[in-house]
């Protein structure tokens, strides 16, 4: 009983560390197109911010970052390094907005730099070497999956933590940009609980035919962000 409890708490601690908002990777610098939506007054209220997050979660992330995370987790379980590299290349091709693409691999490289100090795994070492040799970019969802699997976390817990972390980031940025009250942000996060579970269920065994399906409006806003006259975020 005590051994099971200790393992459960150890896993929880590892998961909380992985999604710690104070990790020095620079995630708070990126809005991934949200800033453009706010400047264009498409997202301008609590209701429209919640709609935006729901759309991102269930119409974008589950076919993009979440799906790639799920597949990378499987590749780690199988010890398939070539598959991890292939997923990195595919994800690079689907991230059409330059700022979002660069932001993702910068976060991934920094995340790997932190956790490779604590997790000794041959695939983490090989992947870091491949990044150094510019054979892969090191995208955030792939690194997130690799680190989580190396820690011994479950895929479902990893997906939930990833989606929760992404949703919190969008809500935090939206509250700041629109602006909204902090309580509005908490209300949106509370209302997302069911959708987060749904996203995990849809991502456990992703259909590879749907990889890269995205919200075109978000891709366009992410590209437009490059030429905004004033901006707070890097993407």
UniProtKB/Swiss-Prot annotation:
Cellular component per GO, a single term: cytoplasm
InterPro entries reported in the protein's UniProt record: UreF, UreF_sf
Subcellular localization(s) per the UniProt record: Cytoplasm
GO terms for MF: nickel cation binding
Source organism, top-level taxon: Bacteria
Keywords assigned: Chaperone, Cytoplasm, Nickel insertion
Pfam families: UreF
The keyword Transport is assigned to this record: no
UniProt family annotation: Belongs to the UreF family.
Primary role: Required for maturation of urease via the functional incorporation of the urease nickel metallocenter.
Subunit structure: UreD, UreF and UreG form a complex that acts as a GTP-hydrolysis-dependent molecular chaperone, activating the urease apoprotein by helping to assemble the nickel containing metallocenter of UreC. The UreE protein probably delivers the nickel.
Name the record gives this protein: Urease accessory protein UreF
Gene name of the record: ureF
